[in-house]
Amino acid sequence: MKRRIIEVDYTEIGGFEASGLLTSEQVADYVRETIPTSHLEQCPNIQYEPDNPEFVSYPYGLAFFDPETHEIKVGPAERFGLIAPEQEMIDTVTHEIGHNAHQNLIEHRLEIAAKWADLYERSKNGENDFVSRYASTNEYEDFAESYMTYVRDPGLLQFVSPEKYALMRDFIFAGREYPPREVGRE
């Protein structure tokens, strides 16, 4: 099968045809229509790469973001859920783009990164306003999970942590808000 690469801004998206779940065109269309292009800055590629050695080291990992290269690699299709694996793959791509956006904040907007770190610490110290168990792992996963939830299920983030929702809306997405997730659609 020919490896198809689609460019979104300066980010190459490719290899997803091999997943059997989504095409590179579908992923690129989603990213183009949904994610602010500034969130792709410094991210050279988003690749479906199930044979990447990182996935041997992390047998349950769905994807990873490399903070040095800003590359995003998505893992084997069989690791995605049985009920809606296509949506889980899109959720995962969104989560990994969230890591890229967070890394760019750390590198260029320390005051916003510090606000996020403070929200994470407050959550960790008793407020328990995480959108998922995985979000409680560390401030990086909290940001990426909250980013994904802001885009994919904004009502959940607004319910769980109005402060994190407001920070995402005001500082990360420049006021852009997403429609609520429709029950039964995803």
Tell me what each language-model feature is.
Residues 20-35:
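Export/targeting segments at the very N-terminus of extracytoplasmic proteins
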Residues 7-22, 39-186:
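Active-site-flanking segments in enzyme catalytic domains
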Residues 1-5:
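Disordered inhibitory propeptide/activation segment of secreted metzincin zinc metalloprotease zymogens
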